[in-house]
């Protein structure tokens, strides 16, 4: 179990309270698909992913990005129980979807970039360190069923 100090929890919740889940989720997933194009193979039913413009404008990318970031919000609500929060999602991604668990880490790092771009004033190095810890814990929880 991961320990979160009161300051860490406050930094997480203060940034999260400002996040537009639809906008940031769409941007994070689009960036993942553009920067790491091999991740597109998990989204072959999304239609046109042939260029950055196509990916950014793809409504299925937007919708799934919102879904992913909404799910990430569950970690924010359950900081002391992240592993159990993602148990079913880990099983789904491992046993049914066969997603490489490294992709969770990549998406977490992309989320850090998106948050830093959107909240430049609030996203101090200390805040970044806390969010890096959070995305690492979430990635580990999502990869749990792979072990």
Swiss-Prot record:
Q: Which InterPro entries match?
A: Globin, Globin-like_sf, Globin/Proto, Hemoglobin_b, Hemoglobin_oxygen_transport
Does the entry feature the keyword Transport, yes or no?
yes
- SUPFAM superfamilies given for it? Globin-like (SSF46458)
- Give start and end of each Globin domain: 3-147
List keywords of the entry alphabetically: Heme, Iron, Metal-binding, Oxygen transport, Transport
Any one of the GO BP annotations: hydrogen peroxide catabolic process
Sequence positions that bind heme b: 64, 93
GO terms for cellular component = haptoglobin-hemoglobin complex; hemoglobin complex
**Leader sequence segment:** none
- Molecular function, one GO term: oxygen carrier activity
Q: What does this protein do?
A: The rho chain is the major early embryonic beta-type hemoglobin chain.
Q: Which family is it part of?
A: Belongs to the globin family.
What name appears for this protein in its UniProt entry? Hemoglobin subunit rho
